[in-house]
């Protein structure tokens, strides 16, 4: 999972993620927006979940982050998982609306994002 951090002309941090993980970048850009307290909450949840069967979720305005002890899923809130309503041959997975990655990989991006933001 590759990523890049940039600052736009106004100094706002933007995240770009590799193909298949774009939604994780959107989550940082739309939900985190340099809010390090939110990252603290996510890291605390990851520590609590490690080695357990529980899961944790944080719904935002545009995206929801879901996590268990092994995996992180970020999905657009407009994406509905209504299996009975799916048309035959249609797949709910849309790389513009859903990304999955391992918890450790995600936490590496969180730590790198925090470092980048604090470099002001």
UniProtKB/Swiss-Prot annotation:
Family the entry assigns: Belongs to the UPF0231 family.
NCBIfam families in the cross-refs: PRK05248.1-1, PRK05248.1-3
Protein name: UPF0231 protein YacL
A family per Pfam: UPF0231
InterPro entries: UPF0231
